[in-house]
Amino acid sequence: MAGGVGGRVVVGRHVYGNLYGCDSRVLRDEAALITIVKEAVKVANAMLLSIGSYRFGPGGGLTVFAVVAESHISIHTWPEHGFATVDVYTCGDHTDPKAAFDYIVSQLRPKRVEVFFGDRSMYGE
């Protein structure tokens, strides 16, 4: 992974955010969310290992979670509030977590997005 400063080595990049004002029908559509996450894996240039989903009660929110060789991609939804959180964490210079995040946002079409970035780092000895 990309080198760091002062012995710090970035081993992963984390892009995550809050999506407000999403269409609640999409946030309840398990098949659509699974398709979106699978495509986000491709956009990130990651390798899908497994994908799962869980619905929180009838008509409730969903969690869709992809385990990728490089880490994970997830969407958690609260359709009753038109709200979703998205989490994309990848390791390796070959991956692009921001592109995957942007793809998911383009599919959920929120009215407002808060996005955060974090480097996961370690220090050499």
Curated annotation (Swiss-Prot):
Keywords: Autocatalytic cleavage, Decarboxylase, Lyase, Polyamine biosynthesis, Pyruvate, S-adenosyl-L-methionine, Schiff base, Spermidine biosynthesis, Zymogen. The modification Pyruvic acid (Ser) is found at residue 71. Its EC number is 4.1.1.50. Its cofactor is pyruvate. Pathway: Amine and polyamine biosynthesis; S-adenosylmethioninamine biosynthesis; S-adenosylmethioninamine from S-adenosyl-L-methionine: step 1/1. The record marks 70-71 as: Cleavage (non-hydrolytic). Binds 1 pyruvoyl group covalently per subunit. It comes from the Archaea. One of its GO terms (biological process) is spermidine biosynthetic process. The active site is at residues 71, 76, 91. It holds the Pfam family AdoMet_dc. GO terms for molecular function: adenosylmethionine decarboxylase activity. It catalyses: S-adenosyl-L-methionine + H(+) = S-adenosyl 3-(methylsulfanyl)propylamine + CO2. Gene3D superfamilies: 3.30.160.750, S-adenosylmethionine decarboxylase domain. Is synthesized initially as an inactive proenzyme. Formation of the active enzyme involves a self-maturation process in which the active site pyruvoyl group is generated from an internal serine residue via an autocatalytic post-translational modification. Two non-identical subunits are generated from the proenzyme in this reaction, and the pyruvate is formed at the N-terminus of the alpha chain, which is derived from the carboxyl end of the proenzyme. GO terms for cellular component: cytosol. Belongs to the prokaryotic AdoMetDC family. Type 1 subfamily. Catalyzes the decarboxylation of S-adenosylmethionine to S-adenosylmethioninamine (dcAdoMet), the propylamine donor required for the synthesis of the polyamines spermine and spermidine from the diamine putrescine. NCBIfam families: SAM_DCase_Bsu (TIGR03330). PANTHER family: S-ADENOSYLMETHIONINE DECARBOXYLASE PROENZYME. This is S-adenosylmethionine decarboxylase proenzyme. It comes from Pyrobaculum aerophilum (strain ATCC 51768 / DSM 7523 / JCM 9630 / CIP 104966 / NBRC 100827 / IM2).
